[in-house]
Every structure is written in structure tokens, then in C-alpha cells.
Amino acid sequence: VVAGLFGGWIYLVPFFTGAAADRMGFRKALILAFALLTVGYGTLGMVTTLTPVLIGLGLIVLGGAFVKPVITGTVSKSSDSFNRARAFSIFYMVVNIGSFTGKTIVAPMRIQMGVETVPWFSAGSSLLALILVLLIYRPPEDGAEQPRNMRETLQGMWMAMSNLRFLGLILITAGFWAIQGQLYASMPDYVLRMAGETYKPEWYANVNPLVVVLFVVAITQMVRKWKPENSILVAMVMIPFSAVAMASSAFIEGPVNIFGLAVHPITLMMVIGISIQGLAECFLSPKYLEYASKQDPPGKEGVFLGFAHINTFFAWIFGFIFSGFLLKKYCPEPTTLPDAIAVQHTQWLAGQAPIPEAYAHAHYLWFAYIGVGLISLVLLIGYIWFTRRLDARRMG
């Protein structure tokens, strides 16, 4: 729940920081962002008590919330309607290169050097980014279009919130990100409790950015002439199947032989499910950002693209809280169970006992997210039907 709240705030605050970035200029905003991230991560590296840790996390949330609308706004300003989707696909590929390499470096660092080194690594990376921004970041700025006062800033925020078509798509795509967010909410606990501590869920999660890096530019090029909602529809069709794959390990008996290697069913089906998620992201994210960028008037790129991230705010708040309840019901923490059941769970993981009744239906967790995906798909189909009918009526 705590992780969901902090993760959610990173996607809510960009609406406000995006408005501030439009006012102050993207260069100043990005300098402030990486300064906040450097100080925030450095604070986490120096302290261990609750209040300073919360202050450090708050600085990280605020810094990250500036980065999102500024970078996507820069992509929007630096591209035209012909190449905007491709520009966003390159941006998204680079983001996932960072995600993949970050996870790859941090996991062994945490194990071999201690978890306390991770904030210092993040602070150093943020400081390097700050130096690069100071040296080379020169975004296209149009001072005449920037909000001149708080009234114009608030008008831009209201313009974004009152765009009901945009708001509808934001709320519908939140269902997609609620499922994708289970990489960090349900999946780690599910893997450790159903396969054992020797399995590393962080490596499973790394499959997602790897797939995106490999395929996002090619897929975006393939769908470049599609309407954004059609590409998003493909993603919405795919995302329930990722949850189907993750649930399917419950129906596979024993290890699966893959090219002579004995692979645990959970490992196999998690990798398949996460790969499906990655491919679905390739259809959704660049075209969604392209759609969002076409809603913003000149000088208001930050606030509109900041508003576009609110779908993930709703997704993480819902997804992490929902995950907490589902894990407690179907895949509980062993230490919360009676001693006899906890012992049986340990023996079951070692292949020396039958599965405890408390874990017999753990895969039902993924059934719930299949439902979330199907509901979102139906809503998107209704959204496309309604908006196209509305457009036809206006043109007729």
C-alpha cells in the first residue's frame, strides 16, 4: 500500500509540475528536477530514521514529477505530426534502456555491496544527468506562448481537465497500467511464496523493458498510420492474456524442459506473461503520448503531458491496494499463518509436502486482473464507438 501511494504520487504530481514547467521553462525545470533527485537520493543514503527518509522520498517524487512532463513535452515540441509517434517510440525505448540497465546493475549491487549503496548510485546518476542538462540541454522554447501569470497557468490546467475525451481515455487506460503495475505489486511476492526464495523476481521484471527496447520502434513504425485509439485497442486486447499466462503456471505439473533445462512453471509463465505486457506497451505508450501531445495548445505541452500520466496514478493506487487484499486472501505471507501451515509451506517448496490449502488457489489473484483487463477492453470499445459516432455527427 505504501509503495502504491508513493508510486502513485509520482504520476499525479506531474499535472502540477507540468504546469509549473510551462511557466518557468523546460530547461530550468529539468535542472531543478535533477537537483531534487540528487538531494533526495543522497538523503536516503545518509539517513535511516523515518522522518528524513520520508523527506528524501518526497524530494524524489517531486523531482521525478518534473522529469516526466518536461521530457515528453520536449519530444512534442521537437517533432511534428508526421514523425511524432516515431519520436515518442525512440523516447520510450531510451526510457526502457535505462530501466533495464538500472535493474541489471542495482540487483547485484544490492546483494554484493549492501542495499545502502543503491541510493548513492542513484544520487550519482542524477548528478551526472544534472551536469549533462547544464551542458547540452537546449529545448525549443517559445516565450510568447508560455503562461505569463498564475491565471493563465490555472486556465491551462482547467483546459486539460475539461477535455472529456482525453479524460475518458486516461481513465480507461488506467486498467492497462493496473495490470502492468503488478510487476512490482503482486508478482514479487507471488514468485517468492509460490516458487521459493532462490527465484529472483527482479530478473523476471527485467523482461518487460528488454522486450520494449527490442520492439517498440518497429511496432510504432508498423502502426504509424493508425489512429491512436486503434493501436491502444490492440494493447487492451493483449493485456488480459498476460494475466492468463501468469495464472497458467498452476495447471503445469513439475518443471518444463526447455532446450535441456528444467524450468519452473512459474518462471516460464511469468516470462511469457511479462513479454506479452512488454509487447502490449509497444502498441500503447507511443501512440497514447502522441494522442496526448495533439491535445495540447502551444505553450501548454507540460501541463497536458503531465495530465496524461494521471492514468498511472489511478492504476497504481488501485492496483497496489487491490493487490494487497488479493495476496492476503490467496497468497498470504507465510509468517502470518499458524506455525504448522508455515512449516508445511516450507516443506512444500522443498517438494516434501502437499501444497497448503492457503496457497491452493493463489492463481485466482491473476483471474482478478483478467477481469480488470476485460472490463477496460469493453470500456475502450464503447469509447471508440461513441467518439466516432460523435465525430460523424459533427461532420455530417
Predicted regions located by residue number:
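Intracellular juxtamembrane helix-capping segments at the cytosolic ends
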Residues: 66-80, 282-297
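C-terminal ends and interior cores of transmembrane alpha-helices
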Residues: 35-49, 237-262
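Juxtamembrane intracellular "pre-TM" segments in multi-pass secondary transporters
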Residues: 143-170
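Extracytoplasmic gate region of multi-pass secondary transporters
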Residues: 164-202, 320
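Central cavity-lining transmembrane alpha-helices of secondary-active solute carriers
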Residues: 3-19, 206-219
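Glycine-rich segments within core transmembrane alpha-helices of 12-TM secondary carriers
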Residues: 85-110, 125-126, 308-323
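Symmetry-related core transmembrane helices of the 12-TM Major Facilitator Superfamily/SLC fold
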Residues: 116-135, 362-382
